[in-house]
Amino acid sequence: MKKEHRIKRSDEFSRVFNEGFSVANRQFVIYVLPKEGQDFFRVGLSVSKKIGNAVTRNRVKRLIRTFFQEHEQAISGERDYVIIARKPAADMTYEQVKGSLWHVCKKAKIIQPKVRAHK
């Protein structure tokens, strides 16, 4: 993911949490903040130490990033997204992560209909 497509700073995370809305399932919570005039979406990841050791946390983050890279064309731009991984995400395969993120993205209405890459 390109640098300008990432949310890194604490104040940016806080703004998404405070001003955006959230949608969740058992494995992930997605906070969404619409941003006018921004041509692309930005993603911030939060994986707590409760999930596991550094290797596990980094693996979960890699899987989430891969999902967003694969579905870049289907995801609505002009928004900031913060994805929080919950404990069950640590033991999931990529196919399970993809299904779970697809589900929560559909609930949040951030994926444009009929544009699904690689099922």
From Swiss-Prot:
Q: Which Gene3D superfamilies match?
A: 3.30.230.10
As its record notes, the protein acts as a catalyst of: Endonucleolytic cleavage of RNA, removing 5'-extranucleotides from tRNA precursor
| UniProtKB keywords | Endonuclease, Hydrolase, Nuclease, RNA-binding, tRNA processing
EC number annotated for this UniProt entry: 3.1.26.5
Q: Does the keyword Nuclease apply?
A: yes
Cited PROSITE patterns: RIBONUCLEASE_P (PS00648)
Which Gene Ontology cellular component annotation is one that this UniProt entry carries?
Answer: ribonuclease P complex
Q: Does the keyword Transmembrane helix apply?
A: no
Domain of life of the organism encoding this protein: Bacteria
Q: Name one GO biological process term.
A: tRNA 5'-leader removal
What GO molecular function annotations does the UniProt record carry, in alphabetical order?
3'-tRNA processing endoribonuclease activity; ribonuclease P activity; tRNA binding
Spell out the SUPFAM superfamilies in the cross-references.
Ribosomal protein S5 domain 2-like
Q: Which family does it belong to?
A: Belongs to the RnpA family.
The entry describes its oligomerization and partners as: Consists of a catalytic RNA component (M1 or rnpB) and a protein subunit.
Report the function annotation for this chain: RNaseP catalyzes the removal of the 5'-leader sequence from pre-tRNA to produce the mature 5'-terminus. It can also cleave other RNA substrates such as 4.5S RNA. The protein component plays an auxiliary but essential role in vivo by binding to the 5'-leader sequence and broadening the substrate specificity of the ribozyme.
Full protein name: Ribonuclease P protein component
Source organism of the structure: Halalkalibacterium halodurans (strain ATCC BAA-125 / DSM 18197 / FERM 7344 / JCM 9153 / C-125) (Bacillus halodurans)
Q: Cite the source lineage.
A: Bacteria, Bacillati, Bacillota, Bacilli, Bacillales
* Chain's gene name: rnpA
